[in-house]
């Protein structure tokens, strides 16, 4: 592929082959790629990974050594003279959800918790994000659908990478810490949580979010594989997690919602449509054990 660079409103999007020599040459062109907050995208026609880092050079070398990233072919790096850590975390989360909603590539990110945190001039940067999305779609062909179409899709609505408000963050933290502690200590007795709320209060979104979080724990992801500060601030994740097989499932009575969530799970690494169950599947699972 040919390399490219686009410049817009004080930010640049640079595209290079995801190869050691190509990344080395790119880093030589701008010293900030070794000491500046950036957002980057690694992609192939079927997969995508989004990250943020203060040291793009070092992070790319880590990814190039990661066998899970060897199928990725292209790196895009988004650089702005006024980016900071908070802006990059927000843009990273925004792009991950948009890629999930677009549905054209499997999203490889883990979910270590994404918090809907406010920061200085957030609305200004959010308008900039719209421009960045348009350029990634039109100039770099990374998205197939418009932003409005994506945001109105079920894939976007039920993305497991949704940003959490403070109440949701507290609920997820309380539940996931206790579940992961029990898994780590091989406890198998019943543990019940009841989350109450009317229609439209986000119960399904929380369930999908927790499924991804627990699946990533069992897959042996490290903290660096996923976006967001929740794990750093609250969740007691070890920095490196032992890989273990977990039988996890989400029981959904409504057939139409089951079909929708299955589509979401097919588009996200670590999740699988077979994890979505009807109430009638439960006796079969019990008998098979």
Language-model regions, residue ranges each:
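GIY-YIG nuclease catalytic motif and its immediate N-terminal context
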Residues: 1-58, 62
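Structure-specific nucleic-acid interaction/processing domains
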Residues: 47, 56-141
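Short secondary-structure boundary/capping segments
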Residues: 66-68, 264-269
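Conserved adenine-nucleotide phosphate-binding loops and their immediately adjacent elements
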Residues: 145-167
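N-terminal pre-P-loop "Q-motif" helix
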Residues: 160-191
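Conserved RecA-like ASCE P-loop NTPase motor core of nucleic-acid helicases/translocases
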Residues: 192-212, 230-257
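Post-Walker A helix-loop "phosphate-sensing" segment adjacent to the P-loop in P-loop NTPases
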Residues: 213-226, 244
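Conserved RecA-like ASCE ATPase "motif II neighborhood" in helicase/translocase motors
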Residues: 267-289
């Amino acid at each position: 592929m040919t390399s490219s660079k686009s410049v817009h409103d004080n930010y640049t999007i640079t595209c290079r082959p995801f190869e050691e020599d190509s990344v080395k040459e790119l880093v030589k062109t701008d010293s900030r790629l070794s000491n500046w907050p950036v957002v980057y995208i690694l992609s192939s026609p079927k997969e995508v990974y989004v990250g943020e880092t203060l040291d793009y050079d070092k992070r790319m070398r880590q990814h190039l050594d990661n066998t899970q990233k060897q199928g990725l072919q292209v790196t895009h790096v988004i650089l702005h003279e006024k980016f900071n850590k908070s802006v990059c975390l927000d843009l990273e989360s925004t792009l991950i959800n948009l890629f999930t909603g677009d549905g054209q590539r499997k999203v490889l990110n883990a979910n270590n918790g994404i918090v809907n945190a406010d920061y200085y001039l957030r609305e200004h940067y959010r308008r900039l994000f719209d421009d960045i999305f348009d350029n990634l779609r039109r100039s770099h062909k990374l998205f197939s659908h418009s932003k409005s179409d994506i945001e109105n899709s079920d894939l976007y609505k039920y993305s497991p990478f949704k940003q959490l408000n403070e109440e949701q963050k507290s609920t997820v933290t309380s539940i996931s810490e206790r579940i992961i502690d029990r898994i780590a200590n091989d406890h198998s007795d019943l543990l019940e949580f009841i989350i109450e709320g009317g229609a439209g209060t986000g119960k399904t979104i929380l369930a999908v979010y927790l499924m991804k979080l627990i699946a990533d724990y069992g897959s042996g992801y490290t903290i660096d594989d996923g976006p967001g500060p929740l794990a750093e601030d609250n969740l007691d994740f070890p920095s490196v997690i032992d890989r273990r097989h977990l039988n996890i499932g989400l029981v959904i009575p409504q057939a139409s919602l089951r079909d929708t969530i299955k589509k979401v799970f097919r588009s996200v690494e670590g999740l699988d449509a077979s994890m979505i169950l009807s109430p009638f599947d439960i006796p079969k699972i019990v008998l098979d054990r």
